[in-house]
Amino acid sequence: MGFPKVERLLINYKTLDEFKKFKGCGAQELSMLEELQANIIENDSESPFYGIYYGGSLIARMSLYMKRNGGEPFEITGTYLELYKLEVLPTFQKQGFGQMLVNYAKQLQFPIKTIARIQSSGFWDKLSFQPVSVTDGDFYIWHPETNSNAITNEESA
């Protein structure tokens, strides 16, 4: 068995069965089962769902959506990612699988917005996300480090 890696999940009946394992493990707001059922098209490769398989079973998952212009008070302009419903099965928690999912999103090099749920603020703090409080709730933002060696269009010949 190879080292687990993050992969885009196909929207199909196998994934639907895998999602059922998460039902009852977490809070209702983390449930993706209904979202998957509503969008089921066999083997849709444009799925917003990403996960980690271990031993042939899905053990961790998240939703990742590309958005534009977070505006005030989000401190995000342009394209950014919304990371939702990150969940790791209880048996596999505290083994780095949640961090693997977040690092996968980070390597795309877009700002990331997420909502900390179920006493997870320490997790997001550890991964260099910054808390932002607004009147309708709290969330966390991560900004990619800017590469000072990058050449912009204005600087190129």
Curated annotation (Swiss-Prot):
The keyword Transferase applies. The keyword Phosphoprotein does not apply. InterPro entries: Acyl_CoA_acyltransferase, GNAT_dom, YlbP. It is an enzyme of class 2 (transferase). Its EC number is 2.3.1.-. It holds the Pfam family Acetyltransf_1. It comes from the Bacteria. Gene3D superfamilies: 3.40.630.30. HAMAP family: Acetyltransf_YlbP. This is Uncharacterized N-acetyltransferase BcerKBAB4_3748. It comes from Bacillus mycoides (strain KBAB4).
